[in-house]
From Swiss-Prot:
Name of the coding gene: groES
Organism in which the protein naturally occurs: Streptococcus pneumoniae serotype 2 (strain D39 / NCTC 7466)
Name by which UniProt lists this protein: Co-chaperonin GroES
An example Gene Ontology biological process: chaperone cofactor-dependent protein refolding
UniProt family annotation: Belongs to the GroES chaperonin family.
Origin: domain of life: Bacteria
Length: 94
């Protein structure tokens, strides 16, 4: 399992095809955001005083993330993205 460092977050993107009138939209025509599940978080960032500020998200949260943010990574057969916490726009509460 991958463990992000600092304020980085490991996400599993929830894949969904978008259609218009039965036609599947190309990737570039889809939304500017993606829904993802938080798989793991880094420990947070340190302030100038040395205090640790923990991430705002936790493992299991569903989040809204910028569509083109992050770095694609693989762990075995699983595909993930690693993003900075600043690229997470919102926590989806259900």
């Amino acid at each position: 399992m991958l463990k992000p460092l600092g304020d980085r977050v490991l996400l599993k993107i929830e894949e969904k095809e978008q259609t218009v009138g039965g036609f599947v939209l190309a990737g570039s025509a889809q939304e500017k955001t993606k829904t993802a599940q938080v798989v793991a978080t880094g420990q947070g960032v340190r302030t100038l005083n040395g205090d640790l500020v923990a991430p705002s998200v936790k493992t299991g949260d569903r989040v809204l993330v910028e569509a083109h943010a992050g770095l694609d990574v693989k762990d075995g057969d699983e595909k993930y993205i690693i993003v900075g916490e600043a690229n997470i726009l919102a926590i989806i509460e259900e």
